[in-house]
Amino acid sequence: MSHGTDRIALPPADAEKTNLVCHFCIVGCGYHVYKWPANREGGRAPGDNALGVDFRRQVPPMQLTMTSAMTTRIRDRDGQDYRVMILPDDDCVVNDGLSSTRGGQLANVLYGDTPVASHRLRYPRLNTGDDWVDTTREHAADLYAAITQRVLDSEGPDGVMFNCSDHGGAGGGFEFTWGTGKLMFQAIGTKMARIHNRPAYNSECHASRDMGMYELNSAYEDAELADVIWSIGNNPYENQTNYFLAHWVPNLRGQTRSKKQERFADETVGRGRVIFVDPRRTPSVAVCDQIGDADNVLHLQINPGTDTALFNAIFTYVIDQGWHNESFIADHTSGFEEAREANRMSLEEASQITGVSVEAIRRAAEWSYKPKDSGHSPRTLHHYEKGIIWGNDNYRIQASLVDIVLATGNVGREGTGISRMGGHQEGYTRPPYPGPRPAPYIDQEIIKGNGQILTVWGCNAFQTTCNAEQYKEAIHRRAGIVQQAMAKARGGSVDSMADAVHEATQRDGGLFIAAVDLYPTAFARAGHLMLPAAHPGEIELTAMNGERRIRLSERFMDPPGEAEADSLIAARLANALRRRYQEAGNEEMAERFAGFDWESQEDAFNDGFRMAHEKEIDSQGGETGRLVTYQRLREAGNNGVQLPVQEYRDGELVGTPRLYSDHNFDTDDGRARFQPAPWNGFLSPVAKQKEKYPLWVNNGRTNHIWQSAYHDQHIDYRTGRFPMAPLEINPEDAEAYGIANGDVVELFNDYGSTMAMAYRTPEIKTGQLFMMFGYFNGMVGEVTTEAVDENVVPYYKGAWADIRRIGSMEEYQRSVSFRSRRYT
């Protein structure tokens, strides 16, 4: 492992150079990859190394971001050893040469001289009943097809279930979603699918879409141009680091004032303001407090689950003051009066519900919507994330916020918008989902014993679902039935094994589980078949970031063993099913599995993303996706193009910086729709726990750990910081329960219990806790309820529990830092 070394080999001037978009958060920072034979290295003179930097003298500050974590050694399938260096791209408009703690470790997650390499899946693996053994791609695909064929023939498509990602980045991309989606929805035809982070096949933004607006409608540049930025249920410094540092912070410091003056010559402009809506003082709030002051940083420290009341009061106050945009409402919207009446709430009532003072709510409204000295309305950019998405009735909260945006016309103009901040990157291209709305609640279907085969693709619901304890119990119990049947069928043919599995699922209530992943996750180990996937760099992959910017991550190394792209795994499974139906003489079913004759990721991209103008395809590229090719993206580099593409002109793809600048919204009549969203209290299961238990258990991400820690759990640098999921607790509460820093504690309620590592901090209110989400050692989902909104979007953040001290861990006390993470 190269991390922590005191010497870095420089790439020679002729090193291979390719483009790579960071695997991780939605910002999608651009990086350059340098690859060269391991027995060579570049010189210190600028002409002797590929970086063009003079290392013969001290490199000036901020000229280069380079650490030992950004370089490693790999070995390709030809047996040749290479060095790889991955550095941020100074010319990328997304990150402006910045690197986050996640992107800065990209070299550390390659298959090579790295801590993760020995943990990667290299070959398909089969559970023989009492052990896991390697097998071939062909054997694995044939067994999967044989079992799926039996379920389809006996139960129909709804017997085949999927837990499947729907995003871009390391876990997928447009090729991934098309390959898996074509298999699930077109070939198999199932509606029994759920998405990686929620228990049904739905959108996280149904309300925004129903009201006529796609949820990623602004440009990152808008954060530089806004008068006010709202950050609602979002922690951008930790979760969208370089969007925050490269685009928000300069505005808050007043460094974009001249840019605003050039764009908006007649308007009053100044340094930007930011308003946070969050129950805790996050590191993002702390950073902004240090950069700004009380005149441009406001934190509305809201009571949990009360966002709708806050937004309705602001909506009412703005209208009562006459700050709404009457011409925009009249010309481009419908339903205003209904929403105005339904959402009416006074500042005083909202203050009682939310715990935020009347003065603070009024100040937020004045900053954001009161006309400026020039008479112009403020340009206000509204960003939200999991505090709303996983909040108390997703649909209602989101609708109440979008109502404010529509009332004030803050969409489609520079410096405005209503966009989610996002977690991972995006990359959606699939056939239409064949199920209803609301979609089936797949977790509950599995708990009730439905479904016979479950494919877990690029996700791990054990660590990321709600009501996880009951869900995992059902998975283990039902998978165990199949495991026993497979043990008894050892030594037989593929068909005899498939017969045994089918009998166990149909007669005895078992569940056959196949997993496609980079690693043998806890969910995969609970199952019966594992298929090894590849990630960016090992394959070519396209995805788009939070401003709809699509780029091509280029291949620069071989995947390990028989790992391959997810799209090609989907094709392999589909082709195996087609062969079986052809052999059975069922040409009708065989034809459903046709059209998977892909040999590369580019073939899958061309079949899906580039064909939305001819086929019935739901694609973030839209009908103009046909203009996008791998070669054109390769030429566009790390700046890519913002979707939808307008045209290809003079050798360049021309994109769309922000949506709805023409005020033509995504509705039948082109008018945006107000949505009544009255405050309605808490979802029932959560309300019951709130009455019974004293502590609210909030949850979310931290800067150091990405998603379910699928890479990070294998890296000592990460697990040394957080050996167990940290639980922030106010010192007063900690004293009351006898809890010290580093103690192992147990949270418990009617839904289950989980363990965590105590982390005392005054930045969290008494009566509240904050636990890191999705970790492998301590899972907050085990104390969350099954509560969902009308579209089966879960209230992950709605958990109340009690706490007890388990004891002290000497190693935690010795090696883990409990200094404040607020950096100020």
PLM region spans:
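Long, contiguous, secondary-structure-rich segments that constitute the structural scaffold
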Residues: 568-624, 712-728, 732-824
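Short acidic (Asp/Glu) and glycine-rich catalytic loops that position anionic groups and cofactors
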Residues: 288-295, 340-346, 376-384, 451, ...
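Extended redox/cofactor-interaction regions of prokaryotic respiratory oxidoreductases
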Residues: 176-280, 284, 308-312, 397-541, ...
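Glycine/threonine-rich phosphate-binding loop and adjacent beta-strand/alpha-helix elements that clamp
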Residues: 537-559, 574-576, 761
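N-terminal export/assembly segments and adjacent metallocofactor-ligating motifs
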Residues: 1-321, 357, 450, 457-459, ...
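Short beta-alpha connecting loops at secondary-structure transitions
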Residues: 294-301, 532, 549-560, 714
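N-terminal leader/propeptide and maturation segments of large enzyme subunits in energy/redox metabolism
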Residues: 116-139, 146, 153-157, 171, ...
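Active-site phosphate/pyrophosphate-binding segments
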Residues: 314, 332-439
